[in-house]
Amino acid sequence: MLCAFIFYASLNKKFINLGSKLTLANFSVLFIACAYLSFQFLQDNFAFIYVFENSSNLLPTYYKFSAFWSAHEGSFLLMILLLSGCMVLNNWFFWEEKWMPISNATAAFILFFYLLFQIFTSNPFLTFDIEPNNGTDLNPLLQDPLLAIHPPVLFTGYVLYAITFSLVIAGMFRGFGKELFKNLKFWAGISWFTLTLAILLGSIWAYYELGWGGYWFWDPVENIVLLPWLAGTAFTHSLIYSRNKILLSWMVFLGISTFLLSILGSFIVRSGILNSVHSFASDPSRGVFLLSLFALFAFSSLGLFFSKSVLLKSNWPELMSKQYLLLLNNIVLLVILLIVFLGTLYPIVTEVFYEQKLSIGPDYFSSLITPLVFTLIGLFLAEQFLTSLKANKKKTLLLIGFVSSIFLILFITDLSPINLGLLFVLLVLVILLARALIELALNKDIKILHKVLGHLSVVLLTFAVLVNHQFSESVDVKLKPGDEVQFSGSTLKLDSINIEGKENFDTVVARFSVSEASNEKNLISEKRVYKIGGVITSETGISSSIIKDYHIVLGDRYQDGSWSIRFSINYGIMMIWISSIILLLSMLYGTIRRHGY
């Protein structure tokens, strides 16, 4: 890879061709290595330490395959394979582009140090002198279909942002031409789509697997993934106008920051300094290595950015133009990023330097970020008015006055902040929807559909989160088979308790029925004991509808034969998933359409 970096950086066509061949060879070797490691899992070859620590002969076959990326060594190897594959794609599709060699030289530079990290701190091919009879099994929390696909999606998001970073670096050397911008938008869109999908999958998994009944806990590892996502969101928006030399340097800075935040996240998670329900592997030596990589990439990329500041000089957007609103949007996103960054890292700093354990709870994040989310929604609304103002100033001013009057009435009424927020978001949702329908009816232009749906889905998502926060409720009860309890207009009944044996765990299966009016739902919740290690996990029972979910977690058994049960009624969950999916699809459609597919 070091040779490939040198060949690409030489900008000599003969050497570039040789570098491309080395890149393909590197990808082939990595693919064989990954296939070989997967084969060891499928063969229960516990002579390999990595296989021993993450599998067993009782583990179902499909989880033996996903166990390959379940821990640090395999997951990083997969990420390296994906980065190498992206370099091959760059060679294949953009061979004639003047920026391709610099882009692949940057990616080769990154890949070289990733390989060093893999070899010296995270080698998954180490073996025992004597092969054990069985492994210690895969972490039970990872024995889940959704968690089998979540890590590869997350790593793909990180890797794709490394590619956008390499394109940004290439632009600083070779100039940001039309074709480079086109490909930057494509890679940035796919990167954002992939990372957003990973966050959504993680939220769904947390909701049904971890048992607290929530989809986002402001857990440190959740926050670490959110940091590059926020920067990536700002970066994607900044690409809209930067081709016109507006906010060009801002776009470059955001592209660099997004990549650096993904590296920083890897350092924090792998260093072992976080306590998190999502942390499954840690090693301080890995953290030191990754911190060194972060420092190397940060100093080199930011140093290049400042050295090219004259070439990146761009125009400042006009006051109250769409570009100006876009800049405000970016600033709000970065303020949110700063809040999450400080709330996540401050406890780490106090523990490292002052030996004091400090915990920052969800209230800190919610209280500071919620007003900023409302600000973002207000900017969505302002953009709609700004577009109309240019077309028909008089009617638009009347509409602004009417909407402002409604907002004023809402604010002077005696409503709680959460209810006020709900009404505000609902009103914005109605206005955006009406605006979208009018535009589509008049223009019949489906090309704007992805933008409309994107903003609508964000507002709908905010509305669903507020509904969930305001109206969801739960209760802890003790029930024996046949007992029932009334809660919030619903009747919960424990129908039966049975013990069943599975391939690699024994489970207590509790069957419930929940009735409301004439409707009855049947739910199953489990308490599993895994045969290797004796780890106990709870499997939630969930019945979903568009309005609300019934959520049941089976707890411990008491001496009198009764069981502790947490029964929750969660509102708006399905709306959260639906709005997130709409957001993803709108981004995917826009990305593909812009690239001409």
Where are these regions (language model features)?
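Alpha-helical transmembrane segments of multi-pass integral membrane proteins
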Residues: 107-120, 160, 191-200, 258-266, ...
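Extended, hydrophobic alpha-helical segments in both membrane/secreted and soluble proteins
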Residues: 152, 159-169, 180-237, 259-263, ...
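Contiguous transmembrane helix-bundle modules in multi-pass membrane proteins
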Residues: 1-14, 18, 25-32, 36, ...
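Transmembrane-helix bundle segments that line or gate the permeation/cavity pathway
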Residues: 30-52, 66-87, 117-126, 226, ...
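Membrane-interface interhelical loops and short amphipathic "cap" helices
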Residues: 15-16, 39-73, 123-151, 201-224, ...
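Membrane-interfacial loop-to-helix junctions in multi-pass inner-membrane proteins
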Residues: 13-30, 89-111, 173-193, 241-256, ...
